[in-house]
């Protein structure tokens, strides 16, 4: 079975680990979000791609869900001693090595997709990890701050400001002019099923869908497209998805997120058992819906979520 997954960072990576357990023989292609990418200290940092790579490759800091295990921060301390920032973004020494290799390869003319493949040669994540685009795309957030409206990089909004100021718009800068990376459209066309993990629907999955051609390819693939709600009991399972959902005019409910994706894209939608009352509303929108446990408490629970998603895909496939 060929499965395509549109993945952001922590939520997407953890779901993928469960999917590998649930479908060990599947051929999995991950289309990774690059809207979170940022240039720091002269280096190209790809947080979501790296989180997927480290998580599936066994190098992730399990407790925080991002960054490397057994990390040290000597480089960060030395930069701070020179008065060089930003101090709010925590790059560790091991992590720096990844960004140095990536930046060197990009500087030598390799596209991001080829660089990502080279980095994965070390980590062996067990999936094919492709960035959504080789073109530079950065998500910016328009915020009202200090009495004025300004645009900040998504990482500054998320990490430094902790989404504490009102967001009025979320814009994937560069997406309109971007092209899908080599292999992205082909993977979608050859897929047996497409999955949207419980990643952020605006700044993770939504950013991937903003690259011209990707949304259309999924809608036209003619295979089941199943998503899992990142909202449980009217609140994000993790992160601050409610803040960016509000910025695009979507309420923080499992049903509203399904409607945001729409029946033109989604065939099936999983909500948590606490949201069982919305199943009827989602189905009225033309999307098959089931209520199952959606908390990724451990690998077994996550694998069961993946099994439920694949089962719903089969249900949708067989009228």
From Swiss-Prot:
Gene3D superfamilies, A to Z: CofD-like domain, CofD-like domains
Entry function: Catalyzes the transfer of the phosphoenolpyruvate moiety from enoylpyruvoyl-2-diphospho-5'-guanosine (EPPG) to 7,8-didemethyl-8-hydroxy-5-deazariboflavin (FO) with the formation of dehydro coenzyme F420-0 and GMP.
Self-association state and partner proteins as the record states: Homodimer.
Keyword Transferase: yes
Gene Ontology terms for molecular function: LPPG:FO 2-phospho-L-lactate transferase activity; magnesium ion binding
Pathway(s) this gene product operates in, as recorded in its UniProt entry: Cofactor biosynthesis; coenzyme F420 biosynthesis
Top-level taxonomic group: Bacteria
Record lineage: Bacteria, Bacillati, Actinomycetota, Actinomycetes, Kitasatosporales
Cofactor(s) needed by this chain: Mg(2+)
UniProt entry tagged with the keyword Lipoprotein: no
Recorded name of the encoding gene: fbiA
InterPro entries: CofD, CofD-like_dom_sf, FbiA/CofD
Protein name: Phosphoenolpyruvate transferase
PANTHER family recorded: 2-PHOSPHO-L-LACTATE TRANSFERASE (PTHR43007:SF1)
SUPFAM superfamilies in the record: CofD-like
GO biological process, one term: F420-0 metabolic process
Pfam families the record matches: CofD
EC number: 2.7.8.28
Enzymatic reactions: enolpyruvoyl-2-diphospho-5'-guanosine + 7,8-didemethyl-8-hydroxy-5-deazariboflavin = dehydro coenzyme F420-0 + GMP + H(+)
Protein family: Belongs to the CofD family.
Residues reported in the UniProt entry to bind 7,8-didemethyl-8-hydroxy-5-deazariboflavin: 50
Alphabetical UniProt keywords: Magnesium, Transferase
């Amino acid at each position: 079975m060929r499965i395509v997954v549109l993945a952001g960072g922590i939520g997407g990576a953890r779901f993928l680990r469960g999917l590998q357990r649930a479908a060990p023989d599947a051929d999995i292609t991950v289309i990774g979000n690059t809207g979170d990418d940022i240039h720091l200290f002269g280096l190209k940092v790809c947080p979501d791609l790296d989180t997927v790579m480290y998580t599936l490759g066994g190098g992730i800091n399990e407790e925080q869900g991002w960054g490397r295990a057994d990390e040290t921060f000597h480089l960060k301390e030395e930069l701070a001693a020179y008065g060089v920032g930003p101090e709010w973004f925590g790059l560790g020494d091991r992590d720096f090595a990844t960004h140095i290799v990536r930046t060197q390869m990009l500087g030598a003319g390799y596209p991001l997709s080829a660089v990502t493949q080279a980095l994965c040669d070390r980590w062996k994540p067990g999936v094919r990890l492709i960035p959504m685009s080789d073109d530079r795309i950065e998500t910016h957030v328009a915020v009202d701050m200090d009495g004025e409206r300004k645009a900040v990089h998504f990482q500054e909004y998320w990490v430094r400001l902790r989404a504490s100021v009102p967001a009025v718009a979320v814009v994937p800068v560069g997406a309109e002019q971007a092209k899908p990376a080599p292999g992205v459209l082909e993977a979608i066309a050859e897929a047996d099923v497409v999955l949207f993990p419980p990643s952020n629907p605006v700044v993770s999955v939504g950013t991937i869908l903003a690259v011209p051609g990707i949304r259309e390819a999924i809608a036209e693939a003619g295979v089941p497209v199943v998503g899992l709600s990142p909202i449980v009991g009217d609140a994000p399972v993790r992160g601050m998805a409610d803040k960016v959902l509000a910025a695009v005019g979507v309420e923080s409910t499992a049903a509203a997120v399904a409607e945001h994706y729409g029946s033109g894209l989604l065939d099936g939608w999983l909500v948590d058992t606490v949201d069982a009352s919305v199943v009827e509303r989602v189905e009225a929108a033309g999307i098959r819906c089931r209520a199952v446990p959606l908390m990724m408490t451990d690998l077994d629970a996550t694998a069961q979520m993946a099994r439920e998603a694949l089962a719903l895909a089969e249900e949708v496939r067989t009228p």
